[in-house]
UniProtKB/Swiss-Prot annotation:
This is mRNA cleavage and polyadenylation factor CLP1. ATP binds at E31, K70, N146, S147, G148, K149, T150, S151. It comes from Scheffersomyces stipitis (strain ATCC 58785 / CBS 6054 / NBRC 10063 / NRRL Y-11545). Component of a pre-mRNA cleavage factor complex. Interacts directly with PCF11. The lineage of its organism: Eukaryota, Fungi, Dikarya, Ascomycota, Saccharomycotina. The keyword Membrane does not apply. One of its GO terms (molecular function) is ATP binding. Transmembrane segments: none annotated.
């Protein structure tokens, strides 16, 4: 069967001898776009040639499983006379998949080459002039919702790894849990490939089981909400503190210094200019990439015309982007939380259940801007089953001997625990930890993130 737009010279889809398997030949420079619902699994493997998902190259003849995702497999090159191929197992009619040669990958690869050239220039300078060190590119990705910002961040990170660079990936979108849980802001040095089979396509952090990929170790700041507007003052403060941490890492680590920073953001427009301006200042951004919004690029150039060292470029967004509704987003968040504690089909983790006495711990809570006069604070929480059952608690690095909620603003997060039940009569909290052992007696923050096991 030939596919319109690809000519009639090749059989793009063909049945294989195995029951239910379909062979897909992906022409060079084309994409195999896939939409897999939650609770549905797509199994596939690359049989020959080269294929990648947002820059991460897929292994040959290794079965992969993905679920609850809208993604694409890209064929960048052809070996000899073969087409790039994958073999998929179509286990459900709910899976949407099709081939398209309408790809913007060439634009994204060119962007990577520009960023990599900046890294190489900085690296050469730092070798020749060790007393006058420079920093690599600090790239800020901005755009509307559903414009592909996270996909581009993955691609730039994956291609940087292929180029033997070690960038720091910064996630400023609390909706996504990048090597952490939703509600957090993270910064993670990336020196190993991403895990395309994980719930959000990033991978795991250091945890309680052996991993196929090197575990990532992020710095985590707690925001506690998934929408930046629920407490914008707290969001901007935590972004600023994360920026200080990242710049300090660049000062101490020459590999990260040369690799620079890649910053993913929530949906931001010109009305959010103060947020964008703060991010540019906090991370010393020198390259803004605007996805598919020429008006935003023009407005940003006008607003930042006083910053001669700041470059602003626009790249097109993919025509294959699919709108995701709130239900899909929430389900993805739930899957990432579940994976944080339990792992997935390939990586089984060993979470630990225990009871803790609420009187042995100090618990604070995140507050909405509308609830208090000063939104830049955490308030003491009054533990009860109504506000703790099926919730997520953040374990801070502050010992419980500290009694000031203001100190929580300047601390980072050790990890998260899930509260399944609080016994009001006994004052006992039943928690699930991602690691076995004693529960640290540190200050806790009750987030606005709920989860039912």
């Amino acid at each position: 069967m030939s596919i319109p737009g690809f000519g009639a010279e090749a059989q793009v889809y063909s049945e294989t001898g195995s029951k239910g398997l379909v062979e897909v030949a992906i022409p060079e420079g084309s994409e195999w776009r896939i939409e897999v619902p939650h609770k549905t699994i797509l199994k596939f493997k690359v049989t020959e040639g080269v294929a990648e998902i947002f820059g991460t190259e897929l292994p040959i003849n290794v079965e992969l499983q993905i679920s609850g995702t809208k993604t694409m497999v890209y064929a960048p090159i052809i070996y000899e006379t073969f087409k790039n191929k994958t073999v998929m197992s179509n286990e459900s009619e709910e899976i949407v998949e099709y081939l398209s040669n309408d790809s913007v990958m060439a634009n994204y690869i060119n962007l990577h080459l520009v960023v990599e050239a900046m890294r190489q220039q900085v690296s050469d300078n730092n070798i020749l002039n060790p007393t006058e060190l420079q920093s690599g590119p600090r790239v800020l990705i901005v755009g509307n919702g559903n414009s592909g910002k996270t996909s581009l961040a993955k691609l730039l990170s994956a291609y940087a790894i292929k180029s033997d660079s070690t960038p720091v990936l910064v996630n400023l979108n609390p909706r996504d849990g990048v090597f952490s849980l939703p509600g957090s802001l993270t910064a993670t040095p990336i020196s190993d490939s991403l895990d395309v089979e994980s719930a959000n396509g990033w991978g795991f952090t250091t945890t309680s089981g052996s991993l196929f990929h090197n575990p990532k170790q992020p710095i985590v700041k707690n925001y506690g909400f998934v929408d930046v507007n629920e407490n914008l003052d707290l969001y901007k403060y935590q972004v600023s503190k994360l920026g200080v941490t990242v710049l300090s890492r660049l000062e101490e680590d020459i590999a990260c210094r040369n690799g620079g920073v890649i910053i993913d953001t929530p949906a931001l427009g010109i009305k959010d200019f103060t947020v964008i301006e703060n991010i540019v200042s906090d991370f010393e951004v020198n390259l803004i990439v605007v996805l598919g919004n020429e008006r935003l690029m023009i407005d940003l150039k006008k607003r930042f015309k006083h910053k001669s060292a700041l470059q602003i470029v626009k790249v097109p967004k993919s025509e294959g982007l699919v709108e995701v509704d709130e239900a899909f987003i929430r389900r993805t968040q739930e899957e990432s939380i579940k994976e944080y504690f339990n792992g997935n089909y390939k990586t089984r983790l060993s979470p630990f259940k225990t009871d803790i006495d609420v009187n042995d711990h100090t618990i604070y809570k995140c507050v909405l801007s509308s609830d208090v006069n000063s939104a830049l604070s955490f308030l003491p929480a009054e533990p009860s089953s109504s506000n703790l059952d099926n919730s997520i608690l953040a374990i801070t690095q502050l010992p419980s001997t500290h009694k000031s909620g203001r100190e929580l603003l300047n601390t980072s997060i050790l990890g998260y625990v899930h509260v399944s039940k609080f016994d009001d009569a006994k004052g006992k909290i039943k928690v699930l930890l991602p690691f076995p052992g004693g529960f640290p007696r540190n200050m806790l923050i009750s987030t606005n993130i709920g989860f039912n096991e």
